[in-house]
Each structure stands twice: as structure tokens, then as C-alpha cells.
Amino acid sequence: MFKKTRTKDFKNEVFGEEAKKDFLIGAKIAYETIITEFASGNLKNIKSLIDKKIYDQFNQAIRERKEKGHLTETNFVGINSAVIKEHEKKDNILEVTVEFVSEIISCLRDRNKKILSGDPGKIKKVHDTWKFSRDVRSTNPSWLLIDTQN
């Protein structure tokens, strides 16, 4: 069973304030990287940042986009906030849920460059909740994206 920890207790149970800040810096970098690479259809550069389930979901979405001849245009403007919402621990596995608020310009076009959705001239505020996981026994300090919600 997972042990749930309130956000205020997170720093005391897992790591100190400095490590928490470092985690959020890394989470922000991962968030931007994953969004931009997925939008470009390139999973090679993010394979080490996402678990197999997420990789398979992203790969399927990219395949479907290509089959339909759809093109995405995404410009990542920035992250307004990234807040740790929940921490769970089971045995040696840590899971951290982060709520991101970002600004992105995006649109989806068909083969003829007609806009199907989005607006290439408008900044959109995006709310995402992502869950990251890490095995504390691992010598690899990286966290994996294991779930996304928006």
C-alpha cells in the first residue's frame, strides 16, 4: 500500500528543501523537453525520461498523426508554475505528482496546411498534472514520467 504524505511533510520525509528545489528544476526541464519533442514527433530524445506505457501512448499518437498527414506546430513559451501536489512511497519506489501551469502556442494542420485546431498566433494557458517515479535503490538519479493528466 502506498503511503501518502501531505505536501508540507514531503521535504521532511524524502529530501530537504534544497533537493526539493532541484527536483522541481529537473521536472520543469523534463516537462518542456517532453512537450516539445513529442510535438515534433521525436521520441528518441525523451525515451530515457518516460516509462514504457507513456512511450507507447506517445508513439501511437505520433503514428496516428503521421497516418492522417497532420502536422503540429508548437512553441513553448514558458512555465508559470510547478508545484508538488502529492508524494507517495511504496517500498523503494517514490512517486511525485507535479501540477504545471504553462503557456504554449500550438496548432494542428492538415496536409494542405489548413488549421484543424489551435491558433498559431495565440498563447494558451495549459494546466497539466504529471506523475514522476524513481526507485531509490537505483544509482540513476533520473525520474521517469509515468502518468499525465490535463
Regions found by a protein language model. Give the residues of each.
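Short beta-strand edge/turn micro-motifs at domain boundaries
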Residues: 1-11, 93-97, 107-150
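Core segments of small alpha/beta cavity-forming domains
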Residues: 2-85
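Aromatic-enriched hydrophobic runs in primary sequence
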Residues: 24, 46, 55, 61, ...
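Residue-level marker of positions within ordered structural domains that often coincide
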Residues: 51, 103, 137
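Surface-exposed, charged secondary-structure patches
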Residues: 70-110
